[in-house]
Amino acid sequence: MRPQDRPNFQWKCLAEALYFEARGEPVEGQFAVAEVILNRVDSSKFPNSICRVVNQGTGRKHACQFSYTCDGKLERVANGAAYKKVVRIAQVMINGGIRQLSGGATYYHTTSVAPSWARRFEHTRTIGIHKFYKPAKRSSEN
């Protein structure tokens, strides 16, 4: 078993994603980003571990699910206080924290972009600088 697939390593992957994707967001937004990652783990459309969800597509051009994993920058935690905060959030969520902020979202993006993929999904919430989405319900045709 690879280290990143071990259960006790999953909180580290979640904390890292929260730090690099949402550390400047309000706490509510950080929890919502954690929900997206955990909602993906629970979905059959995504990998079944936090580390695999976070790193999905890394190394493939335009395939990263989380931009920090493919931006070409060295990822270094420079703000210890912010990291401690996201570690606590990660641990709460991994230990069964209630998922009620994102509206069941499995996707999000920053408000500074308008990706074409977002049109295919239902917007559930905007928190801070992130817009959250879930798969759109298909209407039945008569």
Q: Which ranges hold each PLM region?
A:
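Bacterial extracytoplasmic/cell-wall-associated proteins, especially those involved in peptidoglycan
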Residues: M1-N142
